[in-house]
Amino acid sequence: MRAVVQRVSHASVTVDGKVVGAIDEPGLLALVGVTHTDGPAEAAKLARKLWTLRILEDEKSCSDVGAPLLVVSQFTLYGDARKGRRPTWHAAAPGPVAEPLVDQVVEELRALGARVETGVFGARMSVALTNEGPFTVLLEV
């Protein structure tokens, strides 16, 4: 699994003109991608990493300060544009494999005590955010 994680002051995701998930205080936005070899162990590991990653103000984590997370699925994290002019998506897991794993990341975070908002899997989404720092990291588990 891959996640692009951004420290944000606020973020929201909109589908068909309606806000479906938002955080209105400092926290993390995680864009999450799934590949064919990922399973429940990777989803649990990513959730723990997101919850304890010390990239908030004063080197704190979401678990330290109770900061919220906005988790948005993004299969394009496994796009490959090394050849030609058009990316391929062969490394991205298909929806029936990826969706339950993204859901598991969210469920694991909530079980750890996190406040989590989400996008809508497979939907065309608009993501708005204010990146603090800016601070963006790539996680791979």
UniProtKB/Swiss-Prot annotation:
It catalyses: glycyl-tRNA(Ala) + H2O = tRNA(Ala) + glycine + H(+); a D-aminoacyl-tRNA + H2O = a tRNA + a D-alpha-amino acid + H(+). Its EC number is 3.1.1.96. The keyword Lipoprotein does not apply. GO terms for biological process: D-amino acid catabolic process. InterPro entries: Daa-tRNA_deacyls_DTD (IPR003732), DTD-like_sf (IPR023509). Its main location: cytoplasm. A motif (Gly-cisPro motif, important for rejection of L-amino acids) lies at residues 133-134. Keywords: Cytoplasm, Hydrolase, RNA-binding, tRNA-binding. GO terms for cellular component: cytoplasm. The keyword Plastid does not apply. GO terms for molecular function: D-tyrosyl-tRNA(Tyr) deacylase activity; Gly-tRNA(Ala) deacylase activity; Ser(Gly)-tRNA(Ala) hydrolase activity; tRNA binding. It is found in: Cytoplasm. An aminoacyl-tRNA editing enzyme that deacylates mischarged D-aminoacyl-tRNAs. Also deacylates mischarged glycyl-tRNA(Ala), protecting cells against glycine mischarging by AlaRS. Acts via tRNA-based rather than protein-based catalysis; rejects L-amino acids rather than detecting D-amino acids in the active site. By recycling D-aminoacyl-tRNA to D-amino acids and free tRNA molecules, this enzyme counteracts the toxicity associated with the formation of D-aminoacyl-tRNA entities in vivo and helps enforce protein L-homochirality. Belongs to the DTD family. Homodimer. A Gly-cisPro motif from one monomer fits into the active site of the other monomer to allow specific chiral rejection of L-amino acids. This is D-aminoacyl-tRNA deacylase. It comes from Thermobifida fusca (strain YX).
